[in-house]
A protein has these predicted regions:
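C-terminal interaction-tip segments
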Residues: 1-29, 33, 91-113
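A generic structural signal for short beta-strands and their flanking turns/coil linkers
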Residues: 30-32, 44, 83-85
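Short solvent-exposed strand-capping/beta-turn motif centered on an Asx-Ser/Thr pair
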Residues: 36-41, 92
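Beta-strand signatures of extracellular beta-sandwich domains
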Residues: 47-51, 100-102
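Intrinsically disordered, low-complexity Pro/Gly/Ser/Thr-rich segments with frequent PxxP/GP/PP motifs
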Residues: 51-86, 90-92
Length: 113
């Protein structure tokens, strides 16, 4: 098993829920931090979800108002993502919420069993 430490940036350019991180079906991930910033001058609501691939269900884990011109951590705890899981984000104001997800990717490609 190989462990890769990665960062995944995102910018919300639509009001629809957007996949900001997806885990392939041969890996799992441990999300350490989701840093977000609001580059606008007004507060923006941020909703974040985990899509559980094995249950075909989406769970909301963040509903927050991100103040204008500020930074913050959207992940208040570590998130464990299994094979096929994803993180989605949504905001009603486009082009102001941006972020970086820091995570460890545990790649099981080539494992026996």
């Amino acid at each position: 098993m190989a462990i890769f430490y990665k960062n995944q940036g995102f910018s919300l350019t639509t009001t629809n829920a957007t996949t900001v991180l997806s885990i392939n079906t041969s890996s799992v991930a441990i999300v350490k931090d989701i840093a977000v910033t609001n580059t606008g001058s007004s507060p923006a609501t941020l909703d974040m979800y985990v899509y559980d691939y094995s249950a075909s269900t989406t769970y909301q884990f963040i509903h927050a108002s991100v103040q204008g011109a500020c930074n913050g951590n959207a992940a208040q705890t570590v998130l464990n993502l299994e094979e096929g899981d994803a993180i989605l984000a949504q905001t009603p104001i486009v082009n102001v919420i941006k972020g970086v997800i820091s995570y460890a990717l545990l790649d099981r490609t080539g494992e026996n069993g």
